[in-house]
Structures are given as C-alpha cells and as structure tokens.
C-alpha cells in the first residue's frame, strides 16, 4: 500500500507572509500529482497544515522565525484554493511544529506497514524534510520518497541542500 502526504500547501507559504515565486510555481505541479494519484488509485491521501496561534512569538519557532504565519482560522492558514477540493474527504493534520508526530502515529495505527510514503509540498528545507525524517524513523522498512518537482524550499539553495540531506538518510528523491 502507498500513501501520499501533501505537506503545508498553505496560502502563507505560497503568496502570504512566507511565500515565494518557487512555492507559487509548484502549486500546479502538486495539483497534477494529486490528480494523477487519485485517478490511478495509488493509495491513501493525507494533508498536513502548519497551525499556529496568537502566542506564536512566545514559542521557540516564533523566537527563531519572527514572522507570524499560518494562524489558525486566518486566510494564510488555509490550504491554497487550487487544492482545497482534495481536502474534503481526507484527513488533514494540523501541526504546531515542523514534523507531525500525530500523523506518523495515526499511519502506524491505521495503515500498518506501508510499502511507500510519498511526500510533496512546502517547505522542502523545513517541514518536508522534518516529516520525511520522522516517517523514516517510524517506518524504517518503508520506502520514503520525496518528489522534487512538487516541492519548494525557502530558497533554491536550501531546497537543494535539504534534498541532498534526505538522500544521505536513504530517502528517495525523484
């Protein structure tokens, strides 16, 4: 069985407080990948959503990245309009930090030992790598794959470095 996880495709990472041209460019690629995944019935689909609150500045992340973003209930917190239809019937995991331990535990309980977990989304160098590494730890015998063309980092350089780091840790980059 295969699982596709769409990481943090939220307005604040695309056009908002932490948006970039690279993130905007991957939206149609992510949409196409999801459509193909569903059309070919490859497996389960999940989304993650970075979720913060008004006390963000008081958190460790907020002290290190002092840009208020993805505040629950705000437009920036929402999954981008182009992908919202795909979230209607699948689990969306709100996460207060880079990696989503709740998602990993849920997959362990409901999916057993997947053959492959595929990750796409934002940001390669923060939340994609964090979730890929977390899932590799939870599922050491599962192939973890990151689709390069469907990810963007904070910068093109940090995107590339994150992909290289994941490859060193036996995460497939395709």
Language model features with spans:
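Internal catalytic-core helix/loop-beta-alpha segment
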Residues: 73-126
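Active-site acidic carboxylates
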Residues: 1-92, 145, 154, 159-168, ...
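Short, glycine/serine-rich, charged loops/turns that create anion-binding
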Residues: 10-11, 52, 97, 124-126, ...
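Histidine-anchored nucleotide/phosphate-binding helix
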Residues: 31-37, 129-139
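A general structural motif
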Residues: 1, 42, 113-117, 141
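Phosphate/ribose-phosphate-bearing ligand recognition and processing surfaces
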Residues: 121-130, 139, 145-156
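Short strand-loop junctions, especially beta-strand C-caps/beta-turns
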Residues: 16-18, 96, 122, 149
